[in-house]
Amino acid sequence: MLDYKEKFIGEGLTYDDVLLVPAYSENLPHEVNLKSKFTRNIVINTPIISAAMDTVTEHDLAISIAQQGGIGVIHKNMSIQRQANEVRKVKRSESGMILDPITLNEEALVGDALRLMAENKIGGIPVISKERKLKGIVTNRDLRFEKKLNKKIADVMTTENLVTANEDVDLVKAENILQNHKIEKLPVIDENDFLVGLITFKDIIKVKQHPNSCKDEFGRLRVAAAVGVSKDTFERIEALVKSSVDAIVIDTAHGHSKGVIDLLKEVKKEYPNLDVVVGNIATGEAALDLVRAGADAIKVGIGPGSICTTRIIAGVGFPQLSAIMNVKKALEGSSVPIIADGGIRFTGDIPKAIAAGASSVMMGSMFAGTQESPGETIIYEGRKFKTYRGMGSIEAMQKGSKDRYFQEDENDIKKLVPEGISARVPFKGSLKEVMHQLIGGLRAGMGYCGAKDIENLMDAKFIKITSSGMVESHPHDVTITRESPNYNLR
């Protein structure tokens, strides 16, 4: 018979149970380096990730967070084609050089050009032959007074004195060409006049505006996308890869299961160069099994999220700080990074998660209230809110997240067993403003701990505190008269 003491594997701590111990520092907060790893092969400039939730991350938020140095994970509660398009919108949003620009052939009509410009929010389209040789370019100026929608694009496009650049052009040279010729689009061609890319003045401006952007080797913003353990997983992955997704996230409530491990092995066999994040787990044993199966990053978190009810409904979970530390200990010496998913309530929880062993943190509720999130904006008692729901809520499961909770084959809504709720969160303004506070809190924590970079922060020490210590940590014995942008107790 199992000894009673063996039933308990240890003490479970979460962020509110500890504080970081201050240490000698030679670094001011603005001097610290925030670069970290999202996966084994992908570096991010800010260790912050937006969650793959249908009220959090679609292309608008993914673009914004990548511009701030982090990365977004596009949720999967949508059709395969739409998710692939969401990824494509992020990859096309800005680029050193657009490698696969939207084009028109010579036989296209004015109506085709106007439709493509409206759909993709662009002001110019290169016109090519069937062999992809550049023939001209059509811009909104060419079409401004054109009323005949069935007129051939070849009759209105610019062909004379067409300004182009060679393949070896860099952004500095490209900017000079654009300025000297007072144009906004610069087609890039090879020695045989084949179109190989497009450089736009807008992209050059964006590079200057967002110097800390998280980008791939081609200068495009990075983005990840979620997939589940379902019948269409490989079809979804194929579409995402064609859209140039940087990584996929096998997103399940229980990553330490045979179906997930088998899927991971199959994905890595089929796509050996595609980085795959797997989760969610909470133990060292689970982490080792997933790494052996080929995981490029491990997502840790069973039930810490504000809208998750797994710990209450299923009685299963693991306090988040201890879960991160257990997984970190098991992966000691491994190059596979840990993503701490859920439970972040204050900016100070971010340095705590990293000190426990996470390379980055994933958040949902922090971003659900931003203007870039896809949640519905509502007015309640005179204040603006946005909807926010767990992927285990009834509403999200109906939309497509049933497989995350291993209930894919259940079609009767009355028989679904939800592990999440639907809620609302206060409207917070732009994601840039929220990220400023999150990054500021992380920098402050690193400065107090004497950590010059993320790796150094992992050496920081903790002290456990009592409930009285937590009371002392918060503002006390006063009435708050003005709200702070980075502190509230709601």
Predicted regions and their residues:
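Active-site-adjacent beta->alpha loops and helix N-cap segments on the catalytic face
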Residues: H30, S79-R88, E146-N150, F194-C214, ...
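Catalytic beta/alpha-barrel core
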Residues: V73-N77, T103-L104, G124-P126, T164-N166, ...
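Short beta->alpha transition motifs characteristic of CBS
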Residues: I74-S79, I122, P126, K133-L149, ...
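Short beta-strand/loop segments at the ligand-binding rim of alpha/beta enzyme cores
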Residues: V43-S50, G96-P101, E160, D216-A226, ...
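Glycine-rich phosphate-binding active-site loops on the catalytic face of alpha/beta enzymes
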Residues: Q67-R82, V245-S257, D296-A314, I344-I378
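Bateman/CBS regulatory modules and CBS-like beta-alpha motifs in cytosolic regions of diverse proteins
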Residues: H30-I44, A51-M53, R82-N120, V127-S129, ...
